[in-house]
């Protein structure tokens, strides 16, 4: 596999900051927002958005962590480690993930959210949208659109877990 860095740490920071400004612009009542990071890297991105919202607007937006494994149609896991600090009923929930690909993880996250309560609205923020949807799901806030072939992979590294911020494109030797 060939590896190519397609987003560096500075570009990642800018993309998350831009997504935060878009969230501010599109939401009239920021006090009603709840961020829901999809484990694992989605939680880290959601925390960064939460920090930016605090810096820019002075708001403490609640942040939950969604475990989608028990809601997936391709993996059977009994334990659900979802943590949601507030009741999401009648709140505007913003799901946050690192990569949007087929849409299956997001479908599982929506199932999890509906299991927790009845939000007023659910929207989606992703750092990378790579295309290839299998379900009718689209992101409302996108850091980077990176079209890929189905044989390529996107890997998001985050300093919290990987000691570095970047996005890599992995491809078979003959594709890059």
Swiss-Prot record:
Its EC number is 2.4.2.9. A motif (PRPP-binding) lies at residues 93-105. GO terms for molecular function: RNA binding; uracil phosphoribosyltransferase activity. Keywords: Glycosyltransferase, RNA-binding, Transcription, Transcription regulation, Transcription termination, Transferase. One of its GO terms (biological process) is DNA-templated transcription termination. It catalyses: UMP + diphosphate = 5-phospho-alpha-D-ribose 1-diphosphate + uracil. Gene3D superfamilies: 3.40.50.2020. It is an enzyme of class 2 (transferase). Homodimer and homohexamer; in equilibrium. Belongs to the purine/pyrimidine phosphoribosyltransferase family. PyrR subfamily. Regulates transcriptional attenuation of the pyrimidine nucleotide (pyr) operon by binding in a uridine-dependent manner to specific sites on pyr mRNA. This disrupts an antiterminator hairpin in the RNA and favors formation of a downstream transcription terminator, leading to a reduced expression of downstream genes. Also displays a weak uracil phosphoribosyltransferase activity which is not physiologically significant. PANTHER family: BIFUNCTIONAL PROTEIN PYRR (PTHR11608:SF0). This is Bifunctional protein PyrR. It comes from Streptococcus mutans serotype c (strain ATCC 700610 / UA159).
């Amino acid at each position: 596999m060939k590896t190519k860095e397609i987003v560096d740490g500075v570009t990642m920071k800018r993309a998350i900051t831009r997504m935060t400004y878009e969230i501010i612009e599109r939401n009239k009542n920021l006090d009603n927002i709840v961020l829901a990071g999809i484990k694992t890297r989605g939680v880290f991105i959601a925390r960064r958005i939460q920090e930016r919202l605090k810096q820019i607007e002075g708001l403490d937006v609640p942040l939950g962590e969604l475990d989608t494994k028990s809601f997936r149609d391709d993996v059977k896991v009994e334990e659900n480690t979802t943590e949601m600090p507030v009741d999401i009923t009648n709140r505007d929930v913003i799901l946050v993930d690192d990569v949007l690909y087929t849409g299956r993880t997001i479908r599982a996250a929506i199932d999890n959210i509906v299991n927790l309560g009845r939000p007023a609205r659910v929207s989606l923020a992703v750092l990378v949208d790579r295309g290839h949807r299998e379900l009718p799901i689209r992101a409302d806030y996108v850091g980077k659109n990176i079209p890929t072939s189905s044989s390529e992979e996107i890997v998001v590294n985050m300093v919290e877990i990987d000691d570095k911020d970047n996005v890599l494109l992995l491809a078979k030797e003959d594709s890059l």
